[in-house]
Structures are given as C-alpha cells and as structure tokens.
Amino acid sequence: MDLGPNQAIKTLRDGASWHGGDHKWSLPVAQPNGTYAPGEWTPNVAPSICNAGWHLTTQPALWWSHEGNVAAYLAEYVGATSAREGEDKIAVERCRLLRPLSKGELESCGIFTDGEHEVKTGSVYASGSASVTAYGSASV
C-alpha cells in the first residue's frame, strides 16, 4: 500500500489501542456518499518510540490478530516524530484516523481473511478461510 506524506496505519481492537495502551480512538464516520469523515485529532504528546506518543505502523500485519474486532485505519500525523532505523513503527505527536483500510489494501499489507494468496516476501497474517502459499525460504 502506498502511503502519502505524513501517513501511516493504526491497528485497533474494538476501536481502542491494545499493544501497550488502551486509548479509545475517535473513529472515522462513514458518509452517505461512501467517503469518511475523519476522527478527531489526538491530544499533543511528545513522541518517544516505545515510550510515549501515538504509535503508528507501516506494516499492520505485524500488529494484527484474529481475536476480537481488529481493524486497520489510514492515519495522518503532524508534529514531531520518533522512530528507529529499519523499524515498522513510528511515534508521532498528534494524529487522526482518516478511514478504515479496504480489503484490497489489507491484502496489499499482507492481511488475508479469505481466499487463496501467494506470498513471495515479507510478513503476512492469514485468518478465517484464507490460505497462503509461501515460496523460497518463506514458511506458513
């Protein structure tokens, strides 16, 4: 999935953080025309990766689960950021959720909930009726 400038992904369970926090997020609201009204901006927090700030990812499959009501959202952020070289996550000062990811976007990020899929590189998450064929040194 191609992300724009100052965009990343947030995975939530039942609309709340669940990897080291329990913040209840302001979720995007579906509009009659098929678009989404973004959620509210989070409060400002000085970011420090793994310690403080609003944590987002570029690889939601690493933060996914088949347990509970898990969803991934496109997020935009502003302000200071904190990250470690080569990691899949970033801590940001302030962000908001723009919309849920589509099934196709989830699949492009390696999250499969049904169907048959081939994976040649990277990390993926398969659940439900999905099946995945791995190639090379990959394993399922």
Task: Enumerate the language-model features and the residues they cover.
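Short, glycine-biased loop/turn motifs at secondary-structure junctions and
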Residues: 1-139
